[in-house]
Amino acid sequence: MNRLKEKFNTEVTENLVKKFNYSSVMEVPKIEKIVVNMGVGDAVQNSKVLDNAVEELELITGQKPLVTKAKKSVATFRLREGMPIGAKVTLRGERMYEFLDKLIAVSLPRVRDFQGVSKTAFDGRGNYTLGVKEQLIFPEIDYDKVTKVRGMDIVIVTTANTDEEARELLTNFGMPFRK
């Protein structure tokens, strides 16, 4: 069993029940899924760029990404409907906990001038969004093989009803929020 999942079952549930006075343990918010999205705007001109992004995303998450396609045509971007423009991965279960553990313990501390993640990036429904400027913070990415530094969006979807509950859940997992 993953370290974070074990921590959730033992400490986190107990702490949240005490803090929010839940009548049942089943009311405690959980992390439902983590969606990692990498938008590749250069893919319009060069399809090889998208292949590199897909490969890197697969290394980072350990799961094959889904190639996202344009929903509408936009003439100013020379973009047609159905053109591949990015990649995304939805992580659930064991892989989700492994990714979150790696993100909190290894990757985020490797960010340059890191003071913590934003406290205000919650969406009002208990989901947290985090933007990463470069894929090099992940240990699986080899610096010499990177052709272009790319960022990504990481969305942590929880079953929490409020942002306060979600913030407390992530804080208990060890998410380093700014003071």
From Swiss-Prot:
Q: Which InterPro entries match?
A: Ribosomal_uL5, Ribosomal_uL5_bac-type, Ribosomal_uL5_C, Ribosomal_uL5_CS, Ribosomal_uL5_dom_sf, Ribosomal_uL5_N
- GO cellular component labels: ribonucleoprotein complex; ribosome
| GO molecular function terms noted in the UniProt entry | rRNA binding; structural constituent of ribosome; tRNA binding
Q: Specify the superkingdom.
A: Bacteria
Q: Which UniProt keywords apply?
A: Ribonucleoprotein, Ribosomal protein, RNA-binding, rRNA-binding, tRNA-binding
The record's Gene Ontology biological-process terms are: translation
- Quote the subunit structure annotation: Part of the 50S ribosomal subunit; part of the 5S rRNA/L5/L18/L25 subcomplex. Contacts the 5S rRNA and the P site tRNA. Forms a bridge to the 30S subunit in the 70S ribosome.
Described purpose of this protein according to its UniProt entry: This is one of the proteins that bind and probably mediate the attachment of the 5S RNA into the large ribosomal subunit, where it forms part of the central protuberance. In the 70S ribosome it contacts protein S13 of the 30S subunit (bridge B1b), connecting the 2 subunits; this bridge is implicated in subunit movement. Contacts the P site tRNA; the 5S rRNA and some of its associated proteins might help stabilize positioning of ribosome-bound tRNAs.
Family note? Belongs to the universal ribosomal protein uL5 family.
UniProt protein name: Large ribosomal subunit protein uL5
Organism from which the protein derives: Staphylococcus epidermidis (strain ATCC 35984 / DSM 28319 / BCRC 17069 / CCUG 31568 / BM 3577 / RP62A)
